[in-house]
Amino acid sequence: MQVYLVGGAVRDHLLGHPYHEKDYVVVGASPQQLLDQGFSPVGKDFPVFLHPKTKEEYALARTERKSGIGYHGFNFFTDPDVSLEDDLIRRDLTINAMAMDQDGNVYDPYGGQKDLEQRILRHVSDAFIEDPLRVLRVARFAARYARYGFKIADETLLLMQSITQTGELESLTAERVWKETSRALMEDQADIYFDVLRQCHALKVLFPEIDALFGVPQRPEYHPEIDCGIHTLMSLRQACKSNYSLDVRYAVLVHDLGKALTPKDILPRHIMHEERGLIPVEELSNRLKIPTQMKQLALAVCKEHLKCHQAMSLKPGTLWRLLQRLDVLRRPERVEAFINACECDARGRLGLENRDYPQAAFMFKAMQVVRSIKAQDLPAYIQGSEIGEKLIQYRIDALAELKKQYDDSLATE
């Protein structure tokens, strides 16, 4: 029985990239042998076991044969005679098809180290085309390793396009698509994930609302990058640079979906695109089955982002109603996320990536001001239903004073 470290841990070890999970493959053993050593079985479709002490996963070497549609459509075969090479050839990319023994010796039958050195994401074999999930995985790897200069091999991209053409992407469950996409969104260049999906025509299948943005023009005086799709990915890159949460990144990704629905006769203007975007944001979010809180933020950013850009010129009452719609008193963290997403939108423009966004500081201050005014601060003679009315008025008055301070400071600059 031989045990090898495999997959991502070997890849990232050789690359010098941090990793946390370790997976092992066991060659020349039977399930009973592992059970006798105290391993716990956890695999449903094939023999995977947890180490009795470390709880790391150990899988028996196996082969697979396609038997149906989708990433579940495989029959697996495991036997003590299955070799390490047989196990590694079923993997997606050469850089994931390496193994390391307990002495640190690397086994690389399919050229993974060379592709690692040349910064290439290349499929191991033509069996790559049998699993539609690999389109998403390779796109995610492209986003993760872009910092090192990795590119997808031309022949691999062609196979990804072929998978799209088979229609098997539609067999992927919403949960699986979101699992891969949410992980990709948290990479430091998440925009590359969506760019790769577009290159292999998968974006139109899985995210048609986002794909529809490409080729839609915007007014160049506001958006020098012109293309709505490019603006969306530039905005997402800003969210990644600021290391914002998944909620913010998703909201940024979908904030302009309404621009794909703008009547052609008014282009490149996008009047009311915030309202038009609500239905596609709702539909995409429901289809992906994303968490409710994340969807609510995305809808708020879609509907209100122009108000945030205009915050310093809004009337105090209008600003209060905006903060109220954002649930400022109960959910200040959502208002903070909203402001961050709007800032990414403002900076996701060609040549304006580092431009100041004073609206953010103003909105944060406005949030603090209204939250600082509480019922116990009101005069004692104010009672009953009048308390709510007076609280609103006090908050609006405080916002008016804040706006005056900002206006005065701008006038003296």
UniProtKB/Swiss-Prot annotation:
Fetch the InterPro entries from UniProt: CCA_bact, HD_domain, NT_sf, PolA_pol_head_dom, PolyA_RNA-bd, tRNA_CCA-adding_enzyme
What is the catalytic activity of this protein?
a tRNA precursor + 2 CTP + ATP = a tRNA with a 3' CCA end + 3 diphosphate; a tRNA with a 3' CCA end + 2 CTP + ATP = a tRNA with a 3' CCACCA end + 3 diphosphate
Residues annotated as binding ATP are 8, 11, 91, 137, 140
UniProt-listed GO biological process terms: RNA repair; tRNA 3'-terminal CCA addition
Organism's domain of life? Bacteria
Q: What is its EC number?
A: 2.7.7.72, 3.1.3.-, 3.1.4.-
Cofactor(s) demanded: Mg(2+); Ni(2+)
**Ranges where the HD domain occurs:** 228-329
Binding-site residues, CTP? 8, 11, 91, 137, 140
- Write one Gene Ontology MF term: phosphatase activity
Q: How is the cofactor bound?
A: Magnesium is required for nucleotidyltransferase activity. Nickel for phosphatase activity.
Where along this sequence does the record place binding of Mg(2+)?
A: 21, 23
What UniProt keywords apply to this chain's record, in alphabetical order? Answer: ATP-binding, Hydrolase, Magnesium, Metal-binding, Multifunctional enzyme, Nickel, Nucleotide-binding, Nucleotidyltransferase, RNA repair, RNA-binding, Transferase, tRNA processing
Note the subunit structure: Monomer. Can also form homodimers and oligomers.
* Misc. remarks from the entry: A single active site specifically recognizes both ATP and CTP and is responsible for their addition.
NCBIfam families named among the record's database cross-references = PRK10885.1
Record's family? Belongs to the tRNA nucleotidyltransferase/poly(A) polymerase family. Bacterial CCA-adding enzyme type 1 subfamily.
Q: What does this protein do?
A: Catalyzes the addition and repair of the essential 3'-terminal CCA sequence in tRNAs without using a nucleic acid template. Adds these three nucleotides in the order of C, C, and A to the tRNA nucleotide-73, using CTP and ATP as substrates and producing inorganic pyrophosphate. tRNA 3'-terminal CCA addition is required both for tRNA processing and repair. Also involved in tRNA surveillance by mediating tandem CCA addition to generate a CCACCA at the 3' terminus of unstable tRNAs. While stable tRNAs receive only 3'-terminal CCA, unstable tRNAs are marked with CCACCA and rapidly degraded.
Q: What is known of its domains?
A: Comprises two domains: an N-terminal domain containing the nucleotidyltransferase activity and a C-terminal HD domain associated with both phosphodiesterase and phosphatase activities.
Under the heading HAMAP family, the entry gives:
CCA_bact_type1, CCA_bact_type2
Spell out the protein name for this chain: Multifunctional CCA protein
